[in-house]
């Protein structure tokens, strides 16, 4: 991997640096909402398009598979282009993919549109992190990453509930229309405010030293750790909304409250879990949270007709613990690779996250069936498999060699 020759601040004015990061966070927000919105719209889409759970799972997994593959392929050529030009082209492709979702007349074309969105979205995420690496000195890079990553929590708190409101009142296409308009506005803001990288771009996402990365058994264990962690999560998440509506007396227009409450709590707990990992050891905290998450996973996937308030409480506990594993878990991964290989390793690991998410949702879709009256059956079996994946991630994480950060 080419090492940077200097680590000087790109922005001389701290205000300009913060505006740059807020712009990236806003662009990331549109991508996260686009990725997340399909899952809580499951009940509406399955009814409107007569989708089986397997067909819906394919639609969710198509996005993540496409993002994973595109993320790997883009690492080969992305660093040959000036960052701003590359981001504007890729973001426009993402916008067009979102527009295709809004225009899709049937499930087959919606599936193709999701593949387009996922492909451009996966490259866009790589570019966001590359821009941060190019423009922000190492001393402030962690805080910069944290600011941009808040897009995930904000998407859960505001973006997904608003999208569900639009879909419940104006049809499933309206969230994609709103996203297209909002993203197009962000494109023009980026055209004006996103700076050109005047110095050579750092190779933050290229598959440099590819053979060295794949030649180390510890790296393969780390990839398996990521697959178990993300695959177990996405066996459950895409079907929560559909399960609550079909089996638990939760109405479609009540679903936004689940995501608002879950996102609000995770906005605070994610940082807290990360701090616990720094204080008590990354693997130790990851193992604690993972063991604590097994119970909520099993309870949620065997949830009875207990109504809205019980569903909100269960969703909050589930989201806090399942997402809470990611803070110490992802930090743990950075300890297994030497610095000169870290860029390529993390690029491959990000692609593995996407592929594992797609594999988890696709596998669960093959297991779940609709019973009498549209009720979900065998979601409990999915819960047991997800619990096994969580336990497997603990075993795999124990072999990564970190005991105290």
Residues of each region from the PLM?
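Juxtamembrane intracellular "pre-TM" segments in multi-pass secondary transporters
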Residues: 5-14, 195-225
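Conserved MFS/SLC helix-loop-helix module at the cytosolic interface between two early adjacent transmembrane helices
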Residues: 69-105
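Cytoplasmic helix-loop-helix junction between adjacent transmembrane helices
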Residues: 113-151
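Extracytoplasmic gate region of multi-pass secondary transporters
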Residues: 38-39, 219-260
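A membrane-interface helix-boundary motif in multi-pass transporters
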Residues: 168-180, 368-388
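C-terminal transmembrane helical hairpin of 12-TM major facilitator-type secondary transporters
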Residues: 283-329
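Helix-breaking motifs and short loop linkers at transmembrane-helix boundaries and internal kinks
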Residues: 50, 82, 103-109, 303-305
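Helix-loop-helix hairpin linking two adjacent transmembrane segments in secondary transporters
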Residues: 138, 147-194
